[in-house]
Amino acid sequence: MNRIHAVILDWAGTTVDFGSFAPTQIFVEAFRQAFDVEITLAEARVPMGLGKWQHIEALGKLPAVDARWQAKFGRSMSAADIDAIYAAFMPLQIAKVVDFSSPIAGVIDTIAALRAEGIKIGSCSGYPRAVMERLVPAAAEHGYRPDHWVATDDLAAGGRPGPWMALQNVIALGIDAVAHCVKVDDAAPGISEGLNAGMWTVGLAVSGNEFGATWDAYQTMSKEDVAVRREHAASKLYAAGAHYVVDSLADLPEVIAHINARLAQGERP
């Protein structure tokens, strides 16, 4: 049948951890612990969506971070430096990720609605397997149980922005065509992942990394501040190539209905 058969969902900022705070704060702590180098939370957010080693590498290439590194060590960050920061990052992230495992508002109901339509739920993450092995059962205790999940270090080909994790979900879920899949993510590398896999892509402008607010802060934010942050996030996600941008996963069923109508007319991603 010419309709959406599966959605492939990101984790932090998409289905759990409103604002994607679990990984960002840990990057700040890992830089400090490994080398006593300060980075800001805003800087930590810039490469979000990549695998965590690649994320650290990208942070080291940010001009402001590189300038601080050069001032302290007289050189740019090396692969060995990245390894050391990653080694500090991993135990911190494994210890903290369970604290950020609660599903974002609307996720459980949305998943139930999608499954009622016969849609399978795949997922993938920039987290490595060691972190996912803590996060997945913790999220399950809160009621979120995707049909499949893939970690960023599971596949020899690599992670985002390549298509491989998304395509591994297609294989595992037995989906007949990538055009019948939707990749949902709150960060640009995850949108690129979906596009590279030949899928429809939906960006989340409020629940995730680009908006960058806690749920409590979002609830008390002025309409003007919400609008400014939403526009900032949406512009980045559209620039990455997202077919649609909505606030959160709660808005996905309406988007899927729209995509199904386009598929019925013979359109493809």
UniProtKB/Swiss-Prot annotation:
Function according to Swiss-Prot or TrEMBL: Involved in phosphonate degradation.
Lineage: Bacteria, Pseudomonadati, Pseudomonadota, Gammaproteobacteria, Enterobacterales
Organism: Salmonella paratyphi B (strain ATCC BAA-1250 / SPB7)
E.C. number(s) listed in UniProt: 3.11.1.1
Gene3D superfamilies associated with the record: HAD superfamily/HAD-like, Putative phosphatase, domain 2
Cofactor: Mg(2+)
GO molecular function, a single term: magnesium ion binding
Gene: phnX
Protein's name in the database: Phosphonoacetaldehyde hydrolase
Cellular component terms per the entry's GO annotation: cytosol
